[in-house]
């Protein structure tokens, strides 16, 4: 796992405070210049000025991860808790190779990590134990979004437990209206902002995105939880908001909520992942769509400090490593298979399948 330095966490529209400890940047040391006199008989050496080479970073984005299950589900006998047990490397065993090669792996943590609390009165409620934070720390997952509609499934108690658990593990995160700024071990400073669909105020979001850019972030990422469940295409409002935040200074829009893949769009100098679908999703033992993907985005920092996006690598995958049901272990499709081609079509917008009805 790459070491992540949490610089500071900004709070905006919060269900509760998601402030994290502030780590101040070290003071710049004073530099003393010593003057020397070179004898006239000595030739000055010729110095060839060389610019430092450009730096390349790799970021991995995946979709919805529910480490736990709905207590009222009908597949408890082989649900997430029973399947995983204390084998915290199990969920990402078939994708860890990609996670370990990057600077930061991002996932949407859909559901609280809490050992106490009462479930909300709603159809789908999810919860995982606080021990499941080890799934993140043991699998090179460096940052998460908890800006989603399941974070409060166990009320304020569950939410507070999740925040405390992530903070204690040193994992940067964003919730609704929350901005996090952190730096990778190799010095890439990332600003991350999260928002949920029922509080997507464009003007306010654009303001915070611009603020992250003004704060000196090398890279700005917006993590919206938005769109229509089961829809393979973004809504007009998604498109408009995505374009607005990139115009305001965001580099990457990393969307979630529909539980299916939606297209990737290159817009100006940025890129938009409208929906990443499910990934290791304990909330459904029999999903109607098993397709998912890992998206690996290259980031290039030039010698003058300019940061641009490089190549995007797509790894099409199945949310399960077995046929017939979900075993919560995402596994890449082999190139040339129907699943591989189907994922690529969903991401390039050429998929012609019908949307799934909301359940």
Predicted segments, located by residue:
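Acidic, metal/ion-coordinating pockets
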Residues: 19-23, 29-359
């Amino acid at each position: 796992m790459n070491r992540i330095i949490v610089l500071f966490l900004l709070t905006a529209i919060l269900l509760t405070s998601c402030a994290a400890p502030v780590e101040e940047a070290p003071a710049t040391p004073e530099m003393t210049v010593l003057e020397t006199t070179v004898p006239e008989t000595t030739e000055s050496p010729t110095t060839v000025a060389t610019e430092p080479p450009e730096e390349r970073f790799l970021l991995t984005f995946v979709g919805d991860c529910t480490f736990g299950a709905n207590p009222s589900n009908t597949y408890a006998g082989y649900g997430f808790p029973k399947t995983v047990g204390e084998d915290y490397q199990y969920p990402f065993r078939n994708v860890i190779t990609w996670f370990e090669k990057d600077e930061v792996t991002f996932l949407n943590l859909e559901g609280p990590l809490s050992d106490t609390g009462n479930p909300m009165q709603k159809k789908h409620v999810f919860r995982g134990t606080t021990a499941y934070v080890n799934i993140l720390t043991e699998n090179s997952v460096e940052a998460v979004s908890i800006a989603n509609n399941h974070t409060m499934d166990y009320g304020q108690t569950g939410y507070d437990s999740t925040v405390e658990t992530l903070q204690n593990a040193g994992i940067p995160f964003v919730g609704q209206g929350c901005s996090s700024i952190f730096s990778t071990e190799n010095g890439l400073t990332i600003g991350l902002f999260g928002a949920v669909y029922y509080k997507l105020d464009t003007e306010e979001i654009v303001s915070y995105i611009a603020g992250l850019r003004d704060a000196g972030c090398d890279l700005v990422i917006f993590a919206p939880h938005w769109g229509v469940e089961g829809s393979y295409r973004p809504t007009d409002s998604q498109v408009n908001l995505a374009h607005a935040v990139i115009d305001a200074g965001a580099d990457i829009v990393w969307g979630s909520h529909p539980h299916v893949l939606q297209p990737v769009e290159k817009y100006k100098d940025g890129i938009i992942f409208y929906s990443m679908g499910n990934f290791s999703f304990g909330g459904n033992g029999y999903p109607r769509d098993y397709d998912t993907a890992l998206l690996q985005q290259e980031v290039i920092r030039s010698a003058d400090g300019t940061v641009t996006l490089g190549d995007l690598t797509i790894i099409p995958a199945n949310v399960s490593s077995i046929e017939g049901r979900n075993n919560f272990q995402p596994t890449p499709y082999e190139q040339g298979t129907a699943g591989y081609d189907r994922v690529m079509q969903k991401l390039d917008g050429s998929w012609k399948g019908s949307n799934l009805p909301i359940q």
